[in-house]
Regions:
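N-terminal secretory signal peptides that target proteins for export/translocation
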Residues: 1-4
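Flexible, processing/modification-adjacent segments and terminal tails
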Residues: 30-57, 63, 72-74, 97-180, ...
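N-terminal post-signal-peptidase region of extra-cytosolic proteins
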Residues: 90-95
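Gly/Pro-enriched, hydrophobic low-complexity segments
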Residues: 120-124, 140, 144, 160-263
């Protein structure tokens, strides 16, 4: 029963706390539009992915605050583990007490949810809202835009103080994606994501996300710096007063134990 309540709220965890910073200012269209070939747009997405890819292991603490209309805000804390080599992924909730021990495991493109109160594993889809928030598994995982979407250039816009390239992304056939259509605003100078809007196939806007803070950290496995969003703000476009804030903390890129990404390991941490 508790797992249903948690899943009814929304997405995968990473580390959120609600801040009072306003979202980026509305975009203003620029007169000139840069020219990119289809191949160059794919390379641009690969660059976005590569800047965030560790090529090794990842551990972070996440703070999440979920706000819903007419309800008291709920705060979650979770540990997030990733392994680039085989794209394995774990989210383990540590707070609140009612959700502690619940977790998600991704193995071989299958996403599983575990609830220790019933000792049962259930398979989930990429569209699953994680841990009672408005986030999805992909929000906490490595960026794979070039693998999952076909890009189209819409133009160039001013987004607050940033010059942004605006792309429309359509999901590739045969993939289980949380959102089949995505509109993306990329910082022209860094290629970091500034803003993201996600749509249903019908064209209905479902969610708007802002990425106001990015941080770089040196990766020993990659021998260069990688970037990750320290703060992400999700705004539900269907239930207008619902929002989620995620803060990513204490990132550690050292190697994790070999048997960590298993059901047995997650169950042992849930006892």
């Amino acid at each position: 029963m508790q797992s249903r309540n948690v899943l009814a709220l929304a997405l995968l965890c990473a580390g959120w706390a609600w801040l009072s910073v306003a979202p980026l200012a509305p975009a203003r269209a620029e007169t000139s539009t840069p020219s990119y070939s289809p191949a160059q747009l794919v390379e641009l997405l690969k660059k976005v992915d590569e800047r965030q890819k560790n090529q090794g292991d990842w551990r972070s603490e996440s703070y999440i605050e979920q706000k819903e209309k007419g309800k008291v805000a709920v705060v979650y804390e979770a540990l997030v583990y990733r392994r680039s080599a085989d794209q394995r992924f774990i989210i383990l909730f540590t707070k609140p007490k009612a959700s502690a021990g619940q977790g998600y495991l991704r193995v071989d493109k299958n996403l599983w949810f575990y609830d220790p109160s019933v000792g049962k594993w259930e398979r989930r889809t990429e569209r699953e809202r994680i841990g009672g928030t408005n986030s999805r598994r992909s929000d906490f995982d490595e960026s794979r835009l070039a693998e999952e979407y076909t890009p189209e250039l819409l133009g160039e816009e001013k987004l607050g103080a940033y010059n942004a390239l605006v792309l429309n992304l359509k999901g590739k056939p045969g993939l289980d994606l949380a959102f089949p259509v995505v509109k993306l605003w990329l910082d022209k100078d860094t290629t970091n994501v500034l803003k993201r809007q996600e749509f249903a196939l019908s064209g209905r806007l479902l969610r708007t996300s802002y990425y106001p803070k990015w941080k770089k950290i040196f990766s020993e496995s990659k021998k260069t710096d990688i970037w990750y969003p320290q703060e992400i703000r999700f705004y539900d476009e269907v239930e207008k007063e619902n929002s989620t804030l995620i803060l990513v903390r204490s990132v550690d890129l050292h190697a994790l134990e070999a048997n960590l990404f298993t059901k047995a390991w997650l169950e042992s941490k849930s006892r």
